[in-house]
């Protein structure tokens, strides 16, 4: 009756190159494209999850705390605000709409990485600076689409992601990392 979850928090080191579907995929830990954040998520829950089942819905780490509350039978306090949703219905194979896009606020404080914000769905990705990608055809995000020349489908996706990205508010920190700023400025 125990739920086992295996997941990683990021892609592989940039020193590692893997192969997927006959294509070389360089490690992308710390980067914001697919190989940097699309990671395996494997779950086993005897009697609850059908053996061999596969689900390609979008999930993110915000979903794990509500999931663990749900599995443990703990009611979420009304004053506790959570962005995530329980994955229990998905794990049990229920056909529900979970998420059709995910928001990421990437603001690394530990290394010389550039902060970023973006919203993505299963095909499209929009960054706060306006870069827009068809990730089905450009998984490494090398060629941003010209947003003045989008077809109807791409324009609809852009509009949806732009509205959602803008709705999150907030701002990014300075582009200098704490390593560049020095430890004393971090502690002040």
Segment roles from a protein language model:
Residues 12-32, 49-53, 57, 62-138, ...:
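C-terminal cap/loop subdomain of S1 sulfatases and analogous C-terminal strand-loop tails that border
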Residues 3-8, 40-42, 64-69:
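Beta-strand elements within well-structured catalytic alpha/beta cores of enzymes
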Residues 139-144:
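Surface-exposed loop/edge segments in extracytoplasmic proteins
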Residues 52-54, 147-150:
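Second-shell loop/turn segments in exported
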Residues 41-44, 176:
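Conserved N-terminal phosphate-binding loop of PLP-dependent enzymes in the Aspartate aminotransferase
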Residues 1-5, 34, 101-102:
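Active-site regions of oxyanion-processing enzymes, predominantly non-cytosolic
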Residues 150-176:
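Charge-dense polyanion-binding interfaces
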Residues 1-17:
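Metal-dependent active-site segment of extracytoplasmic phospho-/sulfohydrolases and closely related
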């Amino acid at each position: 009756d125990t739920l086992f979850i295996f997941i990683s928090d990021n892609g592989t080191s940039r020193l590692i190159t893997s192969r997927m579907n006959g294509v070389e995929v360089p490690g992308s830990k710390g980067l914001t494209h697919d190989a940097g954040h699309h990671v395996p998520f494997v779950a086993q829950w005897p009697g609850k999850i059908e053996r061999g089942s596969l689900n390609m819905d979008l999930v993110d780490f915000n979903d794990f705390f509500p999931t663990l509350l749900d599995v443990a039978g703990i009611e979420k306090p009304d004053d506790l605000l959570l962005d995530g949703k329980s994955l229990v219905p998905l794990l049990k194979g229920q056909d529900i709409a979970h998420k059709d896009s995910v928001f990421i606020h990437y603001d690394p404080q530990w290394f010389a990485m550039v902060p970023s914000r973006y919203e993505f769905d299963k095909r499209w990705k929009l960054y706060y600076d306006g870069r827009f990608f068809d990730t089905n055809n450009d998984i490494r995000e090398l060629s941003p689409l010209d947003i003045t020349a989008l077809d109807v489908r791409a324009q609809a996706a852009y509009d949806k992601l732009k509205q959602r990205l803008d709705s999150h508010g907030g701002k990014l920190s300075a582009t200098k990392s704490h390593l560049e700023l020095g430890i004393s400025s971090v502690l002040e």
